[in-house]
C-alpha cells in the first residue's frame, strides 16, 4: 500500500469496506509519509514523537458493526508472528466517515446479522464500562435502541434504506 501511495503521488487515503478494509487504510496511513516500520506503531509501545504528518484518511464503511471508521486503532496481521496486532498513533484518525446505506444493501444476510451483532456488542460494552460521562451511556443506549429496532428489519428486508441507515 505504501509503494502504491508514493508511486501515485497521492495526497490522501480512502479506505472502503468492512473493518479489515478500513484497518488496512489506517495501517497505510501510519507509514505512508514515515520511514518507521508498521510494527513500531504497535499499541503496546509508546507513541513515536517525531513523525511526518499522516495523510488525510477518509473511511467509507460497507457494513454496520465494527465502528472502524471512527477510531485511530487498526488490527493488522503480523504474518511473521502469526497473530493480529493493534497499531495506532494518537494523531492519526479518519478526518471523515462517509455513511451511505446503499453500500450495505448487497451485504449477504449472514454478514448483515454478524456485523449487526458486532454493533450490538459494542453498544453493550459501551454501556457496561464505568463511564466518566453520562452522555456516553446515553449514546450507548441510543445505539442499542437503533439496533433493536432495525437489525431484524434489515435482515428480513435488505432493501429497507431507512433501517439500513439507522444501523
Where are these regions (language model features)?
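A glycine/threonine-rich phosphate-anchoring loop and its flanking beta-alpha core
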Residues: 33-134
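N-terminal small/polar loop signature for handling phosphorylated ligands or for N-terminal nucleophile
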Residues: 1-37, 153-164
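Generic hydrophobic secondary-structure packing signal
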Residues: 21-23, 112, 119, 136-139, ...
Amino acid at each position: 500500500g505504501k509503494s502504491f501511495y508514493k508511486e501515485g503521488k497521492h495526497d490522501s487515503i480512502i479506505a472502503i469496506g468492512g473493518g479489515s478494509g478500513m484497518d488496512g487504510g489506517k495501517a497505510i496511513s501510519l507509514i505512508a509519509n514515515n520511514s518507521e516500520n508498521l510494527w513500531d506503531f504497535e499499541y503496546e509501545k509508546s507513541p513515536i514523537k517525531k513523525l511526518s504528518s499522516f495523510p488525510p484518511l477518509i473511511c467509507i464503511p460497507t457494513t454496520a458493526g465494527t465502528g472502524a471508521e471512527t477510531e485511530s486503532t487498526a488490527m493488522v496481521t503480523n504474518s511473521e508472528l502469526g497473530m493480529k496486532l493493534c497499531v495506532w498513533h494518537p494523531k492519526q484518525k479518519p478526518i471523515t466517515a462517509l455513511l451511505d446505506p446503499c453500500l450495505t444493501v448487497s451485504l449477504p444476510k449472514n454478514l448483515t446479522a454478524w456485523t449487526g451483532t458486532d454493533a450490538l456488542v459494542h453498544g453493550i460494552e459501551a454501556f457496561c464500562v464505568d463511564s466518566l460521562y453520562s452522555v456516553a451511556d446515553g449514546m450507548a443506549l441510543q445505539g442499542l435502541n437503533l439496533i433493536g429496532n432495525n437489525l431484524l428489519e434489515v435482515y428480513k428486508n435488505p432493501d429497507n434504506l431507512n433501517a439500513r441507515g439507522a444501523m
